[in-house]
Curated annotation (Swiss-Prot):
CDD domains: IHF_B. One of its GO terms (cellular component) is chromosome. One of its GO terms (molecular function) is structural constituent of chromatin. This is Integration host factor subunit beta. PROSITE patterns: HISTONE_LIKE (PS00045). One of its GO terms (biological process) is DNA recombination. PANTHER family: DNA-BINDING PROTEIN HU, INTEGRATION HOST FACTOR SUBUNIT BETA. It comes from Vibrio vulnificus (strain YJ016).
Length: 93
């Protein structure tokens, strides 16, 4: 689901709100989440999961076009860990 699809779905379900209000709310939530992670803080949404930063160690990678080895610096990347309720809801089997 894309951000646009999420907004459309919420508009269909929340008819008492304008599409602009819903779009602004979704954008604000995502912006707050991004700025929270940017500052190094963790986000926890009970029953859904948590977002945090994980450090990737420096490593030797490969340029897919040329095959040349490339030194990649260490960096922090966003990480999502689903909560128990979400894992149980999507468990197939």
């Amino acid at each position: 689901m894309t951000k646009s699809e999420l907004i459309e779905r919420l508009c269909a379900e929340q008819t008492h709100l304008s599409a602009k209000e819903i779009e602004d709310a979704v954008k604000d939530i995502l912006e707050h989440m991004a700025s929270t992670l940017e500052s190094g803080d963790r986000i926890e949404i009970r029953g859904f999961g948590s977002f945090s930063l994980h450090y990737r160690e420096p490593r030797v990678g490969r340029n897919p076009k040329t095959g040349d080895k490339v030194e990649l610096e260490g960096k922090y990347v966003p990480h999502f860990k689903p909560g128990k309720e979400l894992r149980e809801r999507v468990h197939i089997g």
